[in-house]
Amino acid sequence: SSVTGVQTCALPILNIENPTKTAACLFVDKEEIGSMGNTGMESNVFSTFMSDVLNKLGVNRPNLLDKMFCNSRMLSADVDAGLDPIYASVADLHNASFLNKGVGISKYTGVAGKANGSDANAEFVAYIRGIFESNNVGYQIAELGRVDLGGGGTIAYILANKGVDVLDCGVPVLSMHAPYEVTSKYDVYQAYKGYEAFFRS
């Protein structure tokens, strides 16, 4: 349910009393229709909020917001397309995520080859893998589907375009966007552990 999704993302940051670095958890919607509107990631609400923080700290100056984004790291906690055995033809069996194998990490997202995609750099992928492995987080590397058959976008490209290191990292789901979706409790728990480990890093 959406409650489980919010808890999986919100509780890790709430568990940290004194983060070593500035930590934020942002909840946005409208991703399926282009992330538009004041609650979508294309909105300027987050940039305005961060500018206000810099102003209240008395440190804001020209281009500081841009530099802040370029020095930021993000996990885009969108769900991953789990391999559905009934519709296996739309997945790349060697690059699909499976239920009960951990949170899915997608280095690349997009459709039709590389259109509207985001591609995390190898160094950032290695950084996240290191955090997960040192905290015993079960994870799997996956793609969203076969080229030109599956695939899909997330909000990762929006922040990546601002200079943020972004990696898609979410729970594999069967029957995504259907009235009845299926996930694994193990994968949800590994996502929770992974997000908390990331906030603590």
Which role fits each region the language model picked out?
Residues L14-L26, D52, V171-S201:
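His/Asp/Glu-rich mid-to-C-terminal helical/loop segments that flank catalytic regions of hydrolases
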Residues S1, M36-S43, K114, S118, ...:
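Hydrophobic alpha-helical scaffolding
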Residues P12-N18, I158-G163:
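Alpha-helix C-terminal capping segments
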Residues E17, M50-G58, D84, R129-F132, ...:
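Structural signal for hydrophobic packing residues in well-ordered secondary-structure cores
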Residues V6, M41-F49, D119-A126, G150-G153, ...:
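Conserved active-site and cofactor/substrate-binding residues in soluble primary-metabolism enzymes
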Residues L14-L99, G104:
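Acidic/histidine-rich catalytic neighborhood of metal-dependent amide-processing enzymes
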Residues S1-C9:
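Single conserved hydrophobic/aromatic residue that forms the stacking wall/gate
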